Design a protein with these regions (language model features):
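Conserved small-residue
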Residues: 32, 51-162, 226-227
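Residues that define the transmembrane beta-barrel architecture of outer-membrane proteins
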Residues: 38-42, 55, 166-170, 244
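Extracytoplasmic gating/loop element in the C-terminal half of outer-membrane beta-barrel translocons
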Residues: 190-244
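Outer membrane beta-barrel strand-and-loop segments of large Gram-negative receptors
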Residues: 4, 8-52, 141, 157-161
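Flexible, solvent-exposed coil segments and beta strand-coil junctions
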Residues: 19-29, 148-155, 234-239
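Outer-membrane beta-barrel translocator domains and adjoining extracellular loop/strand segments
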Residues: 16-20, 71-76, 196-202
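Membrane-embedded beta-strands that build the outer-membrane beta-barrel scaffold
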Residues: 1-9, 42-50, 57-65, 170-176, ...
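Surface-exposed loop/turn segments flanking beta-strands in extracellular/periplasmic regions
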Residues: 22-30, 81-91, 147-149, 204-217
Length: 244
């Protein structure tokens, strides 16, 4: 039987990044080398080989914990892929101190069950006047958290809502051999990451397939505090923690 443990720090520099440039150049962006990402963690590996009669058997397993962080971005925040099409713009970002490709959006704070909850969700401006935080909301829409407490809901209220990078990865392999015959099986697992479920942004087109989650959508007061009402207006239920 063998066992090993390793601590590692890997820094990746000068990654490719598409950066916006002035329009007078006739180009919208250019690819540059920018940014540094640090992967730090620990890895364990163990193996055991034995024999049963004429059959040789082996078990190998490994597990690793990794923390991924952007350490030298350059610009404060750069959008990466526009995942999900019309789900509120770019939701995969790169920023100093955050994991690479983190999901960026509004924090889900439940569902408006009735008009009174919408009317009670307010802020007071510098002149002492009260305003609705989500004036266009309807019962059944997502209530987004007003993080900065200023001027209602705006781009400054978006934050990191998920990490696509797994915290823990594991692998296990089993193998057996007898004379000229051998057999092996390998499994792999990743845990702790979030997945952006774009399919939850259900549109009104009849060509789309729906999952059983459609039956959990809000369809009246008290029916759901997680999934919003069905709506063809994607802006009313923009990307948020609900999509993770």
């Amino acid at each position: 039987m063998t066992f090993s443990a390793d601590y590692f720090v890997k820094k990746t520099k000068d990654m490719l990044l598409s950066m916006p440039i002035p329009l007078y150049t006739s180009y919208g962006s250019m690819t540059v080398n920018s940014g540094t990402v640090k992967n730090e963690g620990i890895e364990f590996e163990a193996s055991y080989r034995f024999k049963v009669g004429e059959v040789n058997l082996g078990i190998n397993g490994n597990a690793s914990y990794v923390k991924n962080t952007v350490t030298d971005q350059g610009p404060d925040r750069v959008g990466l892929n526009n995942i999900g099409g019309g789900m509120g713009g770019q939701v995969s970002w790169r920023e100093n101190g955050r994991p690479y490709g983190f999901f960026y959006g509004y924090l889900h704070d439940g569902i408006f069950q009735n008009q009174q909850e919408i009317d009670n969700y307010t802020y007071v401006d510098s002149n002492g006047k009260t305003h609705l935080i989500q004036p266009n909301a309807k019962p059944g829409d997502i209530r987004f958290k007003d993080l900065d407490g200023k001027n209602g809901l705006n781009g400054d209220d978006r934050t990191m809502i998920g990490n696509p990078n797994p915290d823990l990865t594991m692998g296990l392999s089993l193998n057996a051999s007898w004379k000229a015959i051998d057999f092996s099986i390998t499994t792999y697992g990743a845990f702790g990451q979030q997945i952006l479920k774009c399919y939850r942004d259900i549109s009104s087109t009849p060509l789309n397939n729906y999952t059983a989650e459609i039956f959990q959508r809000w369809h009246g007061e008290g029916t759901s505090d997680k999934f919003p009402r069905l709506s063809s207006a994607s802006s009313s239920n923009s990307v948020s923690y609900t999509h993770l």
